[in-house]
Amino acid sequence: MHTTLFFSNRTQAVRLPKSISFPEDVKHVEIIAVGRSRIITPVGESWDSWFDGEGASTDFMSTREQPAVQEREGF
């Protein structure tokens, strides 16, 4: 989905199409900058959907090469 950026009172804004707008009860959002990208989430919910989701698939990292457990001196 594409949308436009515009300026409102010298502040850059993004216009969200109705089909992807936030629910009406969302009044505040967090914006996380990742390089040239921006992630917009309701305040306090940035990780909630990930933890509430299905999680990783059963084969996630099934072929991961893990080093042997190291013997370490205790504290």
UniProtKB/Swiss-Prot annotation:
Disulfide bonds: none annotated. Residues 3-45 form the SpoVT-AbrB domain. Induction: Induced by amino acid starvation and by chloramphenicol treatment. It comes from the Bacteria. GO terms for molecular function: DNA binding. PROSITE patterns: SPOVT_ABRB (PS51740). The keyword DNA-binding applies. Keywords: DNA-binding, Toxin-antitoxin system. Forms a complex with toxin VapC. NCBIfam families: TA_anti_VapB. Antitoxin component of a type II toxin-antitoxin (TA) system. Upon expression in E.coli neutralizes the effect of cognate toxin VapC. Belongs to the VapB family. This is Antitoxin VapB. It comes from Salmonella typhimurium (strain LT2 / SGSC1412 / ATCC 700720).
